[in-house]
Design a protein with these regions (language model features):
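N-terminal signal peptide
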Residues: 2, 13-35
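Helical "lid/coupling" subdomains associated with nucleotide-phosphate turnover
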Residues: 35, 49, 76-112, 120, ...
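A short acidic Gly-Thr/Ser loop motif
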Residues: 38-46, 199-206
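Intrinsically disordered, low-complexity cytosolic terminal tails
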Residues: 531-553
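Beta-propeller domains
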Residues: 54-71
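Short, well-ordered loop/turn elements at secondary-structure boundaries
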Residues: 3-6, 30-32, 42, 115, ...
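Primarily extracytoplasmic ectodomains and periplasmic/lumenal surface modules that are beta-strand-rich
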Residues: 43-45, 53-56, 128
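Hydrophobic alpha-helical cores of multi-pass transmembrane domains in eukaryotic membrane proteins
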Residues: 9-16, 498-501
Length: 553
């Protein structure tokens, strides 16, 4: 085999490699993409339809993600109450509930696109508070209904209860994506990451905190998450290490139940008549406002309440005192301060303090709703002293006076809508006192920290963890595909190298064989010549001897 033949084989291999390379790194098809995400929260569920235009020159269209809008320009979002977790004892009602959520998505996504449109139904802390048996029963009914009714791209793994860490991570991604913090900036030695912002989210059943850290030393692995936006498998340009913690039972509604239970226990301890208690004074309610709740005689432990069979109807009567309210709230934060060397947060959890001098935190859900009620949202800058004065002023206002003020400020609301509106405002003294206590004492934010930004949207896009979930899942898919491509290319390269080595070995083998044959032939030729010469000499000698014999007498 000649070197010309080897060159021909190498050219063929090169062509094959190029064709494989082109196929492997083929750009995503151009077109409109859709994805449906249902946020099944503790107090209600919300369905979002996101869309993006995949670009021919891009492996990912994440930069174009937005909420799908109808012909009138309204977002395709559907809300349903109560929360999915409330259906544990009424499973037969789940199909109607799910259909009400998905009807808008089905009518706004083109029929031809529905089989390629992923559908995710993800429940949060409300579901996490249920037993695993109840969760399984709910999800079984949800999955069965979706698979038998809709054409969306749906797997059983698409309907599940997300962890608190996932909820915090998704919220952090949403905030920084909408702020453009994932865009690389030019640097002296190439592109560099931007500083990111932190995220705080207080829902109905849990509270999340998430922020980027430079070092994870002394942090348990359960508090550390990583997020990558890299396209190159081996690049570390856009990898983020995060501190993420979710406090189950410390959402606003769950903490209120915990707080009422605590007052009930304290009343029993102080009055030795716990089981006869029908009225308990509550400094976290406005004076003149009452709340009636069903309470069981059981201690409050950790994040959850112990199971109990007995229930008592208790009326909590408001006395409106911020200082006493905070005094009652703080023991429930369980601040033991026993961890070392890092400070301890709620429930004695290790927390690495962020850079309070530079890092902004965006406050979602109750961080916005509560501070908005106090009229302490942007453009008003967060200030602890100002917020405290506002809380004290609000807590000391009699209920009827507060109610009258709200009526004057909302004359455009019908009676029905006003009553619904009041439902979100009536616990303002409790909500504000708890939120500020959790923020400054529970999570260690200094009282001079002024970089909290409570908000519902960024750049006119609603801020929801569901957007972060979409980006995370799309990016994870992209990274998986890129890894597969890298593996394929690596395999092709190894294959080609092996083939080349085999060809070289074959050529070397035949070259050696040919040289050996040539050498042998040369040797054989020399021997033949010598033999011929020898025979000629012998013949000549014989002829000479014969001539001598003839001359002898």
């Amino acid at each position: 085999m000649s070197w010309h033949t080897l060159s021909t084989y190498l050219n063929i291999i090169t062509v094959v490699f190029i064709l494989l390379e082109m196929h492997t790194f083929e750009a995503a098809p151009v077109g409109q993409n859709y994805i449906i995400i249902v946020d099944a929260g503790s107090s209600g569920s919300r369905m979002f339809v996101y869309t993006w235009q995949t670009k021919a020159e891009s492996l990912s269209g994440l930069e174009d993600v937005e909420i799908l809008k109808d012909v009138s320009g309204n977002p395709v979002v559907k809300k349903e109450t109560p929360g999915l977790s409330s259906f544990a004892n009424k499973l037969s009602d789940i199909p109607e509930y799910i259909s009400a959520l998905l009807s808008d998505a089905e009518s706004h996504i083109p029929l031809s696109s529905q089989p390629s449109t992923p559908l995710f139904i993800m429940a949060t802390a409300g579901m996490r508070l249920l037993t695993q048996t109840d969760q399984d029963a709910i999800w079984k009914r949800v999955r069965s209904h979706v698979k038998s009714t809709y054409k969306f791209q749906f797997k059983e793994s698409h309907a599940y209860t997300i962890s608190g860490v996932e909820e915090g991570l998704f919220g952090w991604i949403s905030v920084n994506y909408l702020l453009g913090k994932f865009r690389l900036l030019p640097g002296d030695n190439g592109p560099v990451k931007q500083p990111t912002n932190g995220m705080l989210d207080m829902g109905g059943a849990s509270m999340q905190i998430a922020y980027e850290v430079q070092s994870t030393d002394n942090l348990p692995s359960s508090l550390v998450s990583e997020f990558s936006l890299t396209r190159n498998w081996f690049s570390t340009n856009q990898r983020y290490k995060l501190y993420v913690k979710s406090y189950l039972g410390y959402g606003m509604n769950a903490f209120r139940r915990k707080y009422e239970q605590y007052l009930f226990e304290m009343f029993g301890i102080n009055n030795s008549s716990k089981q006869k208690a029908s009225k308990i004074e509550d400094p976290c309610l406005l004076e003149g406002f009452n709340v009636i709740s069903e309470i069981s005689p059981r201690p409050v432990i950790g994040q959850m309440l112990e199971p109990a069979s007995e229930k008592f109807s208790v009326q909590y009567t408001g006395t409106g005192n911020m200082d006493k309210c905070m005094q009652n709230v703080e023991p429930l934060l369980n601040l033991n301060q026993s961890c070392s060397p890092l400070p301890c947060a709620i429930n004695d959890v290790v927390q690495l303090d962020p850079d309070f001098n530079s890092m902004e935190f965006y406050g979602l859900s109750e961080f916005y709703y509560t501070l908005e009620t106090l009229k302490m949202i942007p453009p008003v800058q967060y200030n602890y002293s100002s917020v405290l004065r506002k809380i004290e002023e609000t807590c000391s206002t009699p209920w009827e006076t507060y109610l009258s003020t709200l009526r004057k400020e909302n004359t455009n609301l019908s009676e029905e809508k006003f009553n619904s509106f009041i439902g979100f405002k009536k616990l303002i003294c409790f909500k504000a006192s708890y939120l500020v206590s959790a923020f400054h004492k529970g999570l260690h934010f200094p009282t001079n920290y002024d970089k909290l930004i409570p908000t519902l949207e960024i750049n006119k896009i609603e801020l929801q963890w569901s957007l972060g979930a979409l980006l995370y899942k799309l990016k994870a898919t992209t990274i998986d595909e890129e890894k597969k491509r890298d593996i394929i290319v690596f395999t092709v390269v190894i294959f080609c190298v092996v083939i080349v080595l085999i060809l070289i070995a074959i050529i070397l083998y035949f070259t050696v064989i040919r040289r050996l044959r040539t050498s042998k032939q040369a040797q054989n030729g020399s021997i033949t010549t010598d033999m011929n010469n020898l025979e000629s000499n012998v013949k000549s000698n014989n002829d000479t001897l014969n001539q001598l014999n003839d001359k002898m007498p």
